[in-house]
Amino acid sequence: MFDNQRFQQLVEADNLTGEVISTNSFIIEVKGLDGVRLGSQVLFEDGQRGLVREAYGDRVILFNIDSEKIVPGTLAVVEADLLQVPVGKQLIGRVVDPMGEPLDNKGPIKANQKSGIFNPAPGIMARSMLNEQLASGVPAVDMFFPIVLGQRIAILGDSKSGKSTFLSQLSANQQGTDRIVIYAMIGKRKVDVETLLGNLESSGAMDHTIVVIADIFDSLTLSYLAPYSACAMAESLWHDGHDVVIIYDDLSSHAEAYRQLSLIQEVDPGRDSYPGDMFYAHSSLLERAGKLLGSDKTLTALPVVVTPNDDITSFLSTSIMSITDGQIIFDLNIFRKGIRPAVNAGLSVSRVGGQAQNARQKRLSGTLFQKMAAFHRAEEFSHFGSSLSENSATDMKVGQQIYAALQQTPGELYSLAEQQLLLETVLLGNGQVEIDIKALKQSIIGLKSDVKDDKEFDHHEADFLKKHSQPVDPLLLVTKPEDKTNATS
């Protein structure tokens, strides 16, 4: 008889059994388990678990899911043909590990369903066109690089460039909708985990969020499994009729964990020592997002990639960008200038964003890009030390006002209508008036009525401009501007 009751039950049920013959860190070699399926979940007699990775005749290679060392001679039994995790609504509002075990001291999770974590992506005939915007509450993203429900859009940037702040804002902005957020934290420090959980709790976002955590003290295998487990939880809710947003923070740590496991396993390394199937590991994960034909429900994926020194040309960065439908890049140099959010407008793009915008929003986005381009040209001229022409000075003024309007603290969130009112009011002034941006924002947020048609927009914008502006001295427009702190790339 075995001390582990679950192990005893599986053995008595005549499940395949084997014996550990060698271990190397998180790699376990088992003799027996003949005919076992790749991806099966294995239970060891000491209660630890493993994932079947490779099979060579009567020898099987497993990843150790847990952190404790397994000694040769330990018996193993197949627990399930697929590695499965609990899924369903019971996980909403909870913090779990990649195996679905609770980490929040709120008691056990009574999930009624389980799902395999390596599910195939929906086929092309099961998908529908993307056409509805996912509002993040951040004008620098929503008005320039709209995220569409069902899209896969990468979030790139160096450490401490504002990525996590933006993702927390996006999560909080889903309050009041039926959308559920799955936030996978991979290989993170305890302080980063606590900061995120604190932000989600304080904003109320935790009520519609599932947080999956594999921190730096967990096993490499848990870090490798975390995004797939989170995706399985998201897919279950998606197929049950919910719009779901999943955040993978971050796939750089996931790739690092997979690289270490592969090197320990003595897999031949490829570029940057990553295994040869690194691209497949991420593409098979991200392809699981989309919009379902019939229900029109969506799974939106936001993979995060850390770009040291703002280098977006690395293997991992370019690999993720080639899989996704766009990228939002946070620039550390812009962040250091005090601009929040520090989005690099020149390198960011949303390839399907236009499909979710109406005609007025498209005109606004186009005008904003034109005004920002004119601002940068005028700024370059100002470096020569001579006075600016009236047109260039106006371009400078408009650009500075746009940047002031885009400046945003972590606690600020704006609906799409509020963002349009804010930026269209600034453009309406055309640099000919001084605008009190702070007072303008307060008035727009205080406007509780739902502004829908063009006449209402035009009326409110003219009214806001009249209330919160005063004429600019014409003599000031042709002098060299002294404030260049708002420049960006």
Question: Where are the language model's segments positioned?
Answer:
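Active-site phosphate-binding and catalytic loops of NTP-dependent enzymes
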Residues: 83-87, 101-108, 125-128, 239-242, ...
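Residue-level signature of catalytic and energy-coupling elements of molecular machines
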Residues: 20, 73, 95, 147, ...
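Conserved catalytic/coupling modules of large nucleotide/cofactor-utilizing molecular machines
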Residues: 253, 267-489
